[in-house]
Amino acid sequence: YGAVSNSFTLSFQRQTAVLSLRTLSRNLGIFFLSALVSSFFLIGCSGTQHDSSANDFDDVQLSDKTVSEEDVQAQNQQIDVENREALIEEAKAKLQLTEDYRDDFIHGEKGADFQKYIVLHDTEGSNDASSVVNGWEASGNLVAAHFIVNTDGSIVQCVPMDKIAHHAGFGDTGHNIDFGVEDESRDDKAGTVPIGGNFADYGMNSYSIGIEMVHVGGSGDYPSAQLEALDNLITYIDAFYGFQSEIIDHKTWRTGNSDTSAEFSTHLQNYKATRKHFA
């Protein structure tokens, strides 16, 4: 009986162990299957959430980027304005400039879109700039340049740069077209009456700044103080408009004029090349 009992007990234990192993295996399979399904579900949800978050992030980034570009553009424009104003003030500070505006010398509006030339003249007299301006006004001819540069380097401005002054007069026939200054409509003197038949074109005034230098042709070279002042004045004009205008002398526009004088010819070539009176 003991042997049978032991055999039965051992058999029962074996069956129980097998059953337990089967149960455990089945339970483990169910567990792992559940875990696997849960993992896929979580990954899917996480991916969806990630995609949604990524899209939200991209939207935020795109929005921020757009705003940032607008801000930067506005800031750069402000910087450009401030830099230009600073350059104008810096250039102007180097001048011994007296502003003595005379309304009678203004002949219309001249915005930056119409600025093309800086025309250099000689006064053909020894009077200082203030006397020259007063003489122009007294003559009643309403002729004037924007600036007059004294031999000591001081400067008088009698016409604002954004206004037309009558300093160049009539040019050679065809020069309006040759110089690209055809539109005379802004000038209160249209230039339809030629002088002697040779000078039918009057457009240069509408597209230029006129600078007179106190000088008499044949009297010798221009003083260094005057030339240095002219250098600085041209720099100021360039800064005011934000670009460089072509530099010519009066006789380039109208042949037969004496200005600028022969002693200025080397300086003129240097101005055209370097915008300074020296090479």
Mark where each language-model region is.
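N-terminal targeting leaders characterized by basic, low-complexity, disordered sequences
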Residues: 1-2, 7
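Basic/polar, cationic surfaces and motifs that engage anionic cell-wall
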Residues: 45-88, 199-210, 214-279
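Bacterial N-terminal signal peptides that target proteins for export
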Residues: 20-32
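Active-site-adjacent loop/helix surface patches within enzyme catalytic domains
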Residues: 88-110, 117-241
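Hydrophobic membrane-insertion alpha-helices, especially the h-region
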Residues: 33-38
